[in-house]
A protein has these predicted regions:
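N-terminal helix-turn-helix DNA-binding core of bacterial DNA-binding proteins
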Residues: 6-48, 69-71, 76-78
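Residues within the DNA-recognition helix of helix-turn-helix
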Residues: 52
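Alpha-helical DNA-recognition elements
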Residues: 55
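Glycine-centered, phosphate/nucleic-acid-interacting loop/turn motifs that mediate DNA/RNA or nucleotide
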Residues: 60
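Short beta-strand "wing" residues that participate in macromolecule-binding interfaces
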Residues: 64
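Accessory beta->alpha helical hairpin/"wing" motif in late/C-terminal subdomains of nucleic-acid enzymes
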Residues: 79-83
Length: 98
């Protein structure tokens, strides 16, 4: 198999899914953000966004922190070092293929 094409088969399946790719790309550009900001930027509904975040958290790519601002609940999200490394590796493999 062509080495460039082999790189496609080796892409991180967790990140490669379009919804999760958008989430990871957005999170890579910031230190952290809250759930509502991410929902607004991705245009994903709450359930879909929560599902994608759970999968990313399971892979140790995203850290989810539940806090309160006064009495209002707030969910903060950030990429972990492993998540940043995985996204950078994904980007490098995509560059090699394209």
């Amino acid at each position: 198999m062509n080495p460039q094409l082999r790189q496609i088969s080796e892409l991180d399946r967790v990140i490669h899914e379009p919804g999760r790719l958008i989430i990871v790309a957005l999170l890579s550009a910031v230190e952290e953000c809250d759930f509502l900001y991410l929902q607004h930027e991705t245009e994903l509904n709450k359930g879909t966004l929560s599902s994608h975040l759970a999968r990313l958290e399971e892979a140790s790519y995203v850290e989810i922190e539940k806090t309160y601002r006064g009495k209002v609940p707030r969910t903060l999200l950030r990429l972990t070092p492993a998540g940043r490394a995985a996204f950078e590796e994904y980007r490098q493999k995509m560059k090699a293929v394209l």
